[in-house]
Design a protein with these regions (language model features):
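Alpha-helical segment proximal to the catalytic Tyr-Lys
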Residues: 59-60, 101-102, 167
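Short, small/polar-rich loop/turn modules that mediate ligand/substrate recognition or access, typified
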Residues: 104, 109, 169-171
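Substrate-binding pocket helix/loop in short-chain dehydrogenase/reductase
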Residues: 30-31, 35-43, 135, 139
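Active-site helix of classical SDR
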Residues: 54, 88, 96
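Residue(s) in the substrate-gating loop at a strand-loop-helix junction
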Residues: 72
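Short C-terminal tail/terminal secondary-structure segment
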Residues: 77, 158-159, 170-183
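Short, flexible catalytic-loop segment of classical short-chain dehydrogenase/reductase
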Residues: 93, 110, 115-125
Length: 183
């Protein structure tokens, strides 16, 4: 947050057209083993971090600006041992609903891009290296398209939501998950 504040203070008097609040972090934690520290860290990154990033950027956002938040398919689809992360992403989804109303008089759109299983280092780091391919295969089997997504596919969805082509899209959640959350 300190770095963000420093960057935004340098932009004083400038305008921000697009804010992509891309925060995500979590651990596979069985229900009986979740600690307060783990809960606070995950919610701190995924919920508190997003809230205060958007709040600090508000003075730079003008009519026509777009805020895009990173959600996740797990916010609507149960996932064993991932309840804290899932709950944090459900909170982010609801930020978009509320903030679209909070900002309606300013003409600022707020949307969520919700990736499914995307082949990133963060996904692989959820399990020990010797189990990664098994994780990838198990997740791909749950995706109707039969594969994991690529980071660039999420980036294209974000670019769309930020563009004028999405000028009448607000408070929506766009799933980039090969259909996983929809069936």
């Amino acid at each position: 947050m300190k770095r963000l504040t420093a960057v935004l203070s340098k932009l004083s008097g400038s305008r921000l057209d697009i804010l992509f609040a891309n925060a995500g972090g979590g651990d596979m934690l069985p229900l009986g083993a979740i600690t307060e520290e783990q809960f606070d860290r995950i919610f701190g990154t995924n919920v508190r971090g997003v809230l205060f990033t958007v709040q600090k950027a508000l003075p730079l956002l003008s009519a026509g600006s777009s805020i895009i938040l990173t959600g996740s398919t797990v916010s609507i689809k149960g996932t064993a041992n991932f309840s804290v992360y899932s709950a944090s992403k459900a909170a982010v989804r609801n930020f978009a609903r509320s903030w679209a109303l909070d900002l309606q008089g300013r003409g600022i759109r707020v949307n969520v891009v919700s990736p499914g299983p995307i082949k990133t280092p963060g996904l692989g780091d959820l399990v020990p290296e010797e189990h990664r391919q098994g994780l990838y295969d198990a997740l791909a089997a749950q995706v109707p398209l039969g594969r994991l997504g690529a980071p660039g596919e999420v980036g294209k969805a974000v670019a769309f939501l930020a563009s004028d082509a999405a000028s009448f899209i607000n408070a929506t959640e766009l799933f980039v998950d090969g259909g996983m959350a929809q069936i």
